[in-house]
A protein has these predicted regions:
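AMP-binding/adenylate-forming
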Residues: 1-13, 21-27, 53
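Short, hinge-like loop/turn segments at secondary-structure boundaries
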Residues: 14-17, 68-73, 204-205
Length: 283
């Protein structure tokens, strides 16, 4: 998704300048794929003919939890359904199966590539994945299953915000932001708010054409309100040159939030671009 968003400002002309005759599918993984980049890749680059194989797995999974089955058809940004051998489910806070709403992505049975533990840290392994529900692996992602059985991801469950009593994942807010042509990437975090409990703060990376445009932040805030409602108007929108990412291009929201609040960002061993931290700063 990060690569798609970075190419999107170049428009369809970029694809027209390349020989794509041997291309049979696009692959996407690492983080939720927002609707606007999905449609750009499918319609403008693939000309509506090349499927987007959106998958979700993890280093600790050593496999694919959710993946597209091209015989099943596609819905924009969907991940199809559980891959072979993966007893995936979406559950509520009590561990009950949930459909049509956002819940925790879990696995109810072992799988061939299952991680057995963390090196010399067995207690941390159990606390990370097995403490919530007995005999159930909690992956740490928000997911949902729609009325047609298609699965969707909504970001990390530990990144969830509670804004005026409404739970929202960063993916919803970020999708609204990157729906603007001026925005290449976004990271949404929640910060303490005396009225709402939490308020969203959004960091955005502008497109090359919008770099230096002082009105980008206002347009991002207005677009989030238009898409999600007035309750989700950001307390602040910060324009930055880059966002901290792991080597697999995942945005490190916990680091963004820690820096914004003046807290210790913790372990940075997986940070790929340390120079990005300079632009975050404290709120």
């Amino acid at each position: 998704p990060t690569l798609i968003r970075s190419l999107q400002p170049h428009g369809a002309d970029l694809a027209r300048s390349c020989d794509l005759s041997s291309l049979v599918a696009f692959g996407s993984t690492g983080e939720p794929l927002n609707p606007d980049p999905w449609w750009w890749l499918f319609r403008d680059v693939g000309e509506g003919k090349i499927p987007i194989v959106n998958i979700s797995g993890g280093t600790e999974i050593a496999a694919v939890i959710l993946g597209v089955n091209l015989l099943q058809g596609l819905k924009p940004t969907s991940l199809g359904g559980p891959s072979l051998g993966m007893a995936a489910d979406v559950v509520d806070a009590a561990g009950r199966p949930l459909r049509g709403e956002v819940g925790e992505l879990v696995l109810r049975a072992p799988w061939p590539g299952m991680t057995r533990g963390f090196w010399k840290e067995p207690d941390r392994y159990l606390a990370s994945y097995w403490d919530r529900f007995e005999g159930v692996w909690v992956h740490g992602d928000w997911a949902s299953v729609d009325e047609d059985g298609f699965w969707f991801l909504h970001g990390r469950s530990d990144d969830t915000m509670n804004i005026a009593g409404k739970r929202v994942g960063p993916a919803e807010i970020e999708s609204a932001a990157v729906g603007l042509d001026e925005v290449v990437a976004a990271a949404a975090i929640g910060v303490p708010d005396p009225v709402k409990g939490e308020a969203p703060v959004v960091y955005v990376v502008p497109s090359p054409e919008a770099a230096g445009d002082t009105a980008v932040a206002d347009r991002v805030a207005d677009e989030i309100v238009r898409v999600l409602g007035k309750a989700f108007r950001p307390a602040a929108v910060r324009v930055v040159e880059d966002l901290p990412r792991t080597r697999s291009a995942k945005i490190m929201r916990r680091v963004v939030r820690a820096l914004a609040l003046g807290d210790d960002p913790g372990d940075l061993s997986s940070l790929e671009n340390p120079e990005s931290l300079e632009g975050i700063g404290r709120l």
